[in-house]
Amino acid sequence: MRLKLFYIISSAYFLSRLTLLYAETIFEDKFAGLNVTFPSGATKRYPDPSKWTFTFLPGTKWPDSYGDGINWLNGNDECQTYVTPFLTQIKGVFIPRDLRYDPFTIKKDGLHIRAQLLSEEQRQAYQTEASYRRFGSGMLRSRESFLYGKIRLVAKLPKARGSWPAFWMLPASFEWPPEIDIFEGMAWGKHAKEFHAGIIPKNTEGKPEGAWYNVGTDLSEDFHEYKLDWTPYAIAGFFDGKQIWYSKTPNSMKKPMYILINLAIGGKWVCNELGILPIDSRKPKRLKEANEIISDQYPSDLIIKSVIVESL
């Protein structure tokens, strides 16, 4: 029995070492930045446009529409608009250069995605029709899609009340569900030491599997690694190398998916979850009032040190 057990343990260890030895890095960005020229003619170190784009979809409605036509921001009642200097017009209306907001800055510690209040003139230029949508922020979407692998992000979360950073995946077929949430953070109030993670399968495959996980450290105080191990059989989430959650892989998640990183602000889940105000989508005045309560917390940054995808 001992010999057999030793053989099993040794074999498992050997296979794990082989995985470490032969795992191939198929995507990597440590955000050193490239010198990118914008439509305005300005040049700046920026996330590599060959690796990332800055909205949910290429070439479709900007900046608030999801792949199947659902208006995602309105669905969540989020209070930000995702923008970039590459966004020069909306619905054929030109955005003046001096009103364009740029949420991305590369510094020594990584890529900063900054959320801040927009001026009234900026909100008009970005056609933010909802009275509560007062913030400008940023989103990254990987141009490449992936099928299985180890997906890692090292990041430091913002402390600002109402912030809702996320690292997640959606199918390359641009449908929803399914969705894999590697983390959703609200590193303030009662969730300062927790993050939310899990999966949302297709409706025919069962209920969403997600929960808050307490990791015992304030996620806004330092950088931490959030990792997903994704195989045809199982999906597992890790925090700083320790497994936190596990789920069987639904059939809808056995196909290529792309990566999203974003910094959302407010919305009914965030406000209700953290008790700013009782919020629902039928009362936009409440969302506007919530914005007034949290607005002194901004600008605030999500800082990303690296994103790496390795083969299994």
Located regions from the model:
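Classical Sec-dependent N-terminal signal peptides that target proteins to the secretory pathway
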Residues: 2-23
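GH16 jelly-roll
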Residues: 23-312
